[in-house]
Amino acid sequence: MKHTLKFILIGLFCCLCNFTVQAQTRNRQYEEYIHKYKDLAIDEMKRYRIPASITLAQGLLESGAGKSTLARKSNNHFGIKCGGDWTGRTVRHDDDARNECFRAYKHPRDSYE
């Protein structure tokens, strides 16, 4: 019985350590994203009066801290779809439906505007 309890406690400790390491990695990715794009968000806040914190939070969520396929390959940090009047570059990506049309930007700055 003592050995079983010992193994259970060791297993729980290992799981907790793994969870902590993953959370630290995620926090570091979030901090890097915020540091990298905060100036863009502040510029847009001045233009449109949307708080930079809200813009950054949405960008973090939609782009997976800049790690999503859309963010990496098309600089689309907000999951913005093409829409009927979009005439710029596009990329196809599976989202709510297969092969949906998303806007592709030359620079992340364009996604923030």
Predicted regions and their residues:
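Bacterial N-terminal signal peptides
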Residues: 8-18
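Catalytic cores of secreted/periplasmic lytic hydrolases that degrade extracellular macromolecules
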Residues: 3, 19-113
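Bacterial N-terminal signal peptides that target proteins for export
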Residues: 1-9
